[in-house]
Amino acid sequence: MITERQQNILRLIIQNYTNTGLPVGSKKLMEDGIASSSATIRNDMKALEEYGLLAKTHSSSGRIPSMAGYRYYVDHLLQPTQVEENELRRIRQSFGKEFHEINDIIRQSAEILSELTSYTAFSLGPEVKERKLTGFRMVPLNDRQVLAIIVTDKGNVENQVFAIPAAVSSQDLEKMTQIINDKLVGQPLLTVYHRLRTEIPMILHRYFQTPEGMMNLFDEMLGHAFEEKVFVGGRMNLLDFGIKQDIEQLKSVYSFMQNSDELTHLLNGSATTENPIVFRIGSEIGNNLLEDMSMITATYEVSGHGKGTIALLGPTSMPYSKIFGLVDTFRHELASQLGDYYRFLGN
């Protein structure tokens, strides 16, 4: 059973260590308000070490937090710090510019959060399942390439260049555009996804000599509308903490950061409506590459448009109270900005 004094000692050690990166000794704790003798404080520190909440370094008689110590602090002792006025002003100014689509706002949010913390930030917009397909066009670029433009009612515009199979003619592409506009435009994306697996293959068999090639093209083009895009800010900040200077590990982390599916999996399933802000520390992140780091994940909700996620990946020695307060404020500011944008669109 941890005593109230031991809790205070643990709290002060973590706050000092996250500020300075230096082990904390009994003298510093006395200066910070622990009203006990040096011997009593050392005994409490030893007890906390035996509980697995503190660790001793070889170079100092002071202590540093363990992973379990950070977890105990986050669960029982953390008190969020209010965001400073200049940081709040900076957030609002960054969101104050003109945006042309929702993804611009989501992308900007990752950049802002990364700049505010010097950590790696992630931002995932409101769920894809809430959207409808509202527009589809194909613009020929040359004989073998076409630009596909996909629009949804949530202000998202996807465009990408696709290679056209040799067996597919320009007449086939015109017919394909007509089918998409007749059968799919105006439908929720979940309905579009279902029809791509059921009704559309039968239609393609009716109209095309090579339905497999057309089906692959359908899948490739419309698949982009279903992707949950994770925007990352400050990728290179990972090199400043947590990553051992091992070239193979650096390659693995870089590859991981380019994998949208992996990043989506990393962000999903942690924060909930009941617990909208969640810290995962070390091995709790569930990825061996990130076991020396901490991650804070937060959900935000835009009324009528679903939920999104923001996250920060940083060192285990991050200032948890400050980061919690910042992320909590940021998620509300982002939700407000997205809500304003949707109202501007009339959605």
Curated annotation (Swiss-Prot):
Q: What Gene Ontology terms describe what this protein does at the molecular function level?
A: DNA binding
**Transcription in keyword set:** yes
Q: Give a single Pfam family match.
A: HrcA
What gene, per UniProt, encodes this protein? hrcA
User: Which NCBIfam families does this chain map to?
Assistant: hrcA (TIGR00331)
Which keywords appear in this protein's UniProt record, sorted alphabetically?
Answer: Repressor, Stress response, Transcription, Transcription regulation
The family assignment reads:
Belongs to the HrcA family.
Q: Which GO terms describe its biological process?
A: negative regulation of DNA-templated transcription
What InterPro entries does the record tag this protein with? GAF-like_dom_sf, HrcA, HrcA_C, WH-like_DNA-bd_sf, WH_DNA-bd_sf, WHTH_transcript_rep_HrcA_IDD
User: What does the UniProt record say this protein does?
Assistant: Negative regulator of class I heat shock genes (grpE-dnaK-dnaJ and groELS operons). Prevents heat-shock induction of these operons.
- Source species, please? Enterococcus faecalis (strain ATCC 700802 / V583)
Highest taxon above the source species: Bacteria
Q: State the name under which the record lists this protein.
A: Heat-inducible transcription repressor HrcA
- For the keyword Ribonucleoprotein, the answer is no
